[in-house]
């Protein structure tokens, strides 16, 4: 995706709700009348949840919350009911991919630079160190070669490869979870190629 690309999505809330426009541009992200400068974006959390009436699944709600300058949040929500707008699952995935490619990779890269310069960084309660990962403040340091991770639909888990009971779980609908998982993936990949 080129830096000059502008991507727009038309989204609906509810069965007959009005359309809301989400625009990704080189210098800004805009949702309806709210515009955020790219430099101000600091984090994202997102999820898809089911709409249940009585015991029946009747639709899906797609939620994204983007944190930007001074801890302000932009909420983007759209949904589908009764099989209408089935394409929204693909739209949701496309929005997340576009957000990453155009904005969020830069946020993660800045955090990685801080980790390299300082030799430690705490994200979402997990401490990343040159020698490994500490899952909690009082926990032991798990060496990088023993750090494992598993990704699931709505969360991921970090664990000690030899002692799976030593682990931590993070929901994708939690602040800093995307940053943490991306840094773990990147560091593990870099260390695998160094061997």
Identify what each model region corresponds to.
Residues 14-54, 120-165:
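Phosphoinositide-binding peripheral membrane targeting modules
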Residues 2-16, 110-114, 131-132:
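The phosphoinositide-binding surface of pleckstrin homology
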Residues 7, 19-22, 104, 111, ...:
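A generic structural signal for ordered alpha-helices
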Residues 43-119, 145-195:
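Acidic, Ser/Thr- and proline-rich intrinsically disordered linker/docking segments
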Residues 5-11, 36, 74-76, 142, ...:
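Generic detection of short hydrophobic beta-strand segments and adjacent strand-loop junctions
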């Amino acid at each position: 995706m080129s830096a000059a690309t502008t991507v727009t999505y038309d989204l609906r809330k509810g069965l007959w709700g009005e359309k809301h426009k989400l625009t990704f541009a080189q210098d800004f992200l805009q949702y309806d009348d709210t515009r955020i400068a790219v430099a101000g974006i600091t984090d994202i959390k997102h999820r898809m949840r089911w709409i249940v009436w009585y015991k029946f699944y009747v639709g899906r709600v797609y939620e994204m919350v983007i944190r930007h300058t001074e801890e302000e949040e932009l909420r983007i929500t759209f949904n589908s009911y009764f099989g209408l707008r089935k394409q929204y699952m693909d739209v949701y995935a496309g929005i997340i991919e576009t957000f990453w490619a155009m904005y969020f990779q830069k946020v993660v890269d800045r955090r990685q630079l801080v980790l390299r310069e300082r030799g430690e960084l705490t994200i979402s309660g997990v401490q990343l160190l040159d020698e490994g990962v500490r899952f909690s403040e009082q926990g032991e340091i798990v060496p990088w070669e023993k750090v494992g991770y598993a990704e699931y639909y709505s969360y991921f888990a970090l664990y000690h490869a030899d002692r799976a009971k030593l682990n931590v779980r993070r929901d994708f609908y939690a602040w800093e979870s995307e940053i943490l998982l991306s840094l773990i993936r990147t560091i593990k990949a870099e260390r695998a190629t160094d061997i």
